[in-house]
């Protein structure tokens, strides 16, 4: 017999009755039923009920066991007594009558229980992550993550992609966030950087004659903590292709992402034939560039119905050309209580309020706005929005660039409050035609809005002849249920166009050469047209596992203060290590 086990804790069935077997695992739960001891023994594969009565030679040993002790149990498989089957367990028809117990690893008092799914403070869960990972839901999430990554790999290979690994130690580059820097011992005063993404390397692969690349790539960004992003590191499905247009990238990747979602959707519908939404339309209709299309609400510009109207607040705003009035339809929201609740919510978001119109039976509009603009304009708004009796509409006004974020939040709030969001689907879409540049209010300059390596629509002619803020890029995102899950673009593969694109954003040619020397040199020796994307593995797994917390799908995540409480990172290093790196600390006084 094997030293530790003949079967796993999820393997035994009623076909094994009367066999003598050996199991090893953790004591998941121990119950004393009037002298009869039940031990639920758990391993990675499942759970088996083990039982000892006072006649068992192992009864005294069984009495000493405690939760999460690791034990080896020998015994005889028998049918559970009539009426005690557990249909929730694959092993639920049998139990193991214990004949021998060996303690392999006792456990101290537990800082958090493994049995059950009780909520515990996050810091406790992260400090004792090895216990947390034994809990059923988190353990299953990690296994699902592995299966999703396997599915991604398989589907990428079916599409003709080849997997390569790019370097982890690389050069620092301005890709939008701070780099994690690694000092060089051999080259005093110089630093490597951990890659924010394999962007330059994957483009260099295309210039090296490879055609279709992918990898599950670790990425590192020294960013301030955010609720929707783990500090430090994340993983992406990184992709690049040669001799492709934007449509070619879509044709290659849409089946991969759709297929992965269908594999793990657990009965939810998955969009087929994704819509392609221009960035400007997404912002106007949904108030965001990552729309949740499960929410049917689409906002509309209704400025014409308030221009010159009796509602002077909006009418005066509209005298300035840049200002607009947008309507947020609220199907079924035509009650005074709901409209007042939305108004209070808006005030809690720092707004002066949220104007509204309700429609009564017969189509009559009600509320302060309706009273001020009159029945004709009120009816025109109702018709434009496709609303009926019992519905409402909410209004935001001013400069859209200032109110668009709030309008998007209001659309989401209305959808949630009125139960309009279809929770039984994964609504996937492409968002396309992103602006190449944006105006940076902090630095008072034009800057890249997304990836600086994207091809401008119109190429060099656009860079030379257009207002930079009107140039669109061959740049695209994939969105799902309100999350951006992938981003990509067709690359700017001509060196003169690359230099001009960076010049517009305030980078001189020498800085481009210094920062991106390897790629810039490669452009001089025949660079193919190429493009690609990167999909966020963590976010995709989070959506498919049905959680809204990235820590619930990550093995050993940091907390929101970018600390690894289990390993004690970041940590101090010895003076000797600092001397070897020629580093002297200059710590803040406080």
Curated annotation (Swiss-Prot):
GO terms for molecular function: aspartate-tRNA ligase activity; aspartate-tRNA(Asn) ligase activity; ATP binding; nucleic acid binding. It comes from Rhodopseudomonas palustris (strain BisB5). This is Aspartate--tRNA(Asp/Asn) ligase. Homodimer. Its EC number is 6.1.1.23. It is an enzyme of class 6 (ligase). Residues 199-202 are annotated as: Aspartate. It is found in: Cytoplasm. Disulfide bonds: none annotated. Keywords: Aminoacyl-tRNA synthetase, ATP-binding, Cytoplasm, Ligase, Nucleotide-binding, Protein biosynthesis.
């Amino acid at each position: 017999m094997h030293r530790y086990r003949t079967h796993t804790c999820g393997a035994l069935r009623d076909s094994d009755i009367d066999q003598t077997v050996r199991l090893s695992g953790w004591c998941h739960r121990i119950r004393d039923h009037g002298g009869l001891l039940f031990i639920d023994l758990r391993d990675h594969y499942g759970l088996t009920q083990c039982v000892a009565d006072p006649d068992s030679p192992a009864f005294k040993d069984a009495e000493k066991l405690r939760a999460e002790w690791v034990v080896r149990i020998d015994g005889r498989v028998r049918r559970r007594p009539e009426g005690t089957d557990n249909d929730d367990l694959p092993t639920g028809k049998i139990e193991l009558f214990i004949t021998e117990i060996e303690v392999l690893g006792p456990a101290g008092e537990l800082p958090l229980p493994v049995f059950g799914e009780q909520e515990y403070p996050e810091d406790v869960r992260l400090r004792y992550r090895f216990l947390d990972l034994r809990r059923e839901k988190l353990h299953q999430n990690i296994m699902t993550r592995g299966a999703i990554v396997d599915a991604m790999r398989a589907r990428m290979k079916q599409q003709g992609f080849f997997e390569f690994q790019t370097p982890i130690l690389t050069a620092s580059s301005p890709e939008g966030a701070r780099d994690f820097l690694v000092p060089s011992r051999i080259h005093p005063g110089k630093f490597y950087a951990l890659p924010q993404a394999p962007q330059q390397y994957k483009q260099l692969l295309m210039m090296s004659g490879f055609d279709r690349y992918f990898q599950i790539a670790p990425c590192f960004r020294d960013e301030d903590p955010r609720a929707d992003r783990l500090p430090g590191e994340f993983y992406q499905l990184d992709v690049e292709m040669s001799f492709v247009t934007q449509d070619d990238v879509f044709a290659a990747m849409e089946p991969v992402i759709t297929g992965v979602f269908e594999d793990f959707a657990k009965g939810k519908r998955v969009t087929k034939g994704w819509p392609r939404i221009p960035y400007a339309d997404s912002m106007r209709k949904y108030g965001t560039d990552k729309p949740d299309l499960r929410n049917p609400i689409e906002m509309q510009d209704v400025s014409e119905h308030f221009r010159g109207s009796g509602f002077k607040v909006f009418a005066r705003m509209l005298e300035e050309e840049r200002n607009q009035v947008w309507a947020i339809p609220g199907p079924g929201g035509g009650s005074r209580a709901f409209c007042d609740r939305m108004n209070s919510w808006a005030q809690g978001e720092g707004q002066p309020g949220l104007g509204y119109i309700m429609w009564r039976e017969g189509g009559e509009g009600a509320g302060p706005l309706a009273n001020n603009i009159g029945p004709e304009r009120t009816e025109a708004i109702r018709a434009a929005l496709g609303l009926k009796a019992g519905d409402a509409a909410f209004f935001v006004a001013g400069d859209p660039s200032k109110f668009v974020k709030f309008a998007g939040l209001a659309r989401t709030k209305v959808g949630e409050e009125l139960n309009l969001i279809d929770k039984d689907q994964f609504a996937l879409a492409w968002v396309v035609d992103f602006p190449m540049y944006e105006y940076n209010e902090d630095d008072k300059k034009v800057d890249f809005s997304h990836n600086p390596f994207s091809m401008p629509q119109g190429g060099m002619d656009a860079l030379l002849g257009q207002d930079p803020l009107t140039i669109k890029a061959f740049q695209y995102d994939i969105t799902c249920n309100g999350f951006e899950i992938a981003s990509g673009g067709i690359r700017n593969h001509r060196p003169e166009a690359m230099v001009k694109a960076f010049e517009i954003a305030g980078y001189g040619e020498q800085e481009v050469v210094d920062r991106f020397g390897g790629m810039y040199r490669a452009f001089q020796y025949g660079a193919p047209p190429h493009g690609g994307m990167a999909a966020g593995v963590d976010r995709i797994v989070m959506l498919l596992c049905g959680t809204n917390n990235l820590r619930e799908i990550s093995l050993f995540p940091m907390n929101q203060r970018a600390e690894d409480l289990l390993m004690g990172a970041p940590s101090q290093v010895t003076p000797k290590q600092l001397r070897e790196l020629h580093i002297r600390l200059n710590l803040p006084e406080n």
